[in-house]
Amino acid sequence: MVKKRVLALLACLGLALALPFAAFADMGPKPSVEVQTAGLDQDCWVTLLAEQTVIGPWNLPGAAMPDWFEPEEQPAWEAFAAYGDPDGYHFLQWQARVADASPATWSYMAPKHFKILFWFPQSGGYAVTEALDRYAYAAVYRVDFSGVDPAAGGVQTVTAQRNYDYGGEALGLAARFALTLAVELLIA
């Protein structure tokens, strides 16, 4: 009886050692694009138009809105899906509501080259930037709407300025490095 239990215990131990155990401590930065606004005084939605048609889980829209969107997001999804960019950039089904006090961030697999497209629900109009690039892991762009009339409808051109916080990003990098190192040392 004891012999069977010892053999069973050894078999379980052997199986446990044979199966790999993975430890993940990836706290590093992820490529992202943040869109900040200034002078925006009405409801607005934003997306990034990408050169590619697929980036990771992001792809071209189908005939119907995907299930992960909330019903109140449907008008914005339809407006972005209907927009035809003259330079061939594509809507990849990422969108967010944006305001001066709450920037929008595409934080997972953001495109490398893109345009920022805004949609104004009240007028149905758009505002679009020139082609931009993700110049850093946490690229930040600020768009000033002081000279833009969202009620005008149609497509207006806006300018996006880089607004990168070098000090804050350096501090964040140091903190992530320390946390990753601490977790790796605890696991090892």
Residue ranges and their predicted role:
Residues L10-P20:
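Bacterial N-terminal signal peptides
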Residues L60-Y108:
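Tryptophan-paired
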Residues K112-F120:
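A short, solvent-exposed beta-strand micro-motif common in secreted/extracellular proteins
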Residues F120-V128:
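Short acidic/polar inter-strand loop motif in beta-rich domains
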Residues L19-P29:
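Sec-dependent signal peptide cleavage junction
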Residues G168-A188:
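Core alpha-helical transmembrane segments of integral membrane proteins
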Residues P29-A38:
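A short, amphipathic beta-strand motif
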Residues E130-G172:
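Short, aromatic-rich amphipathic segments at membrane interfaces
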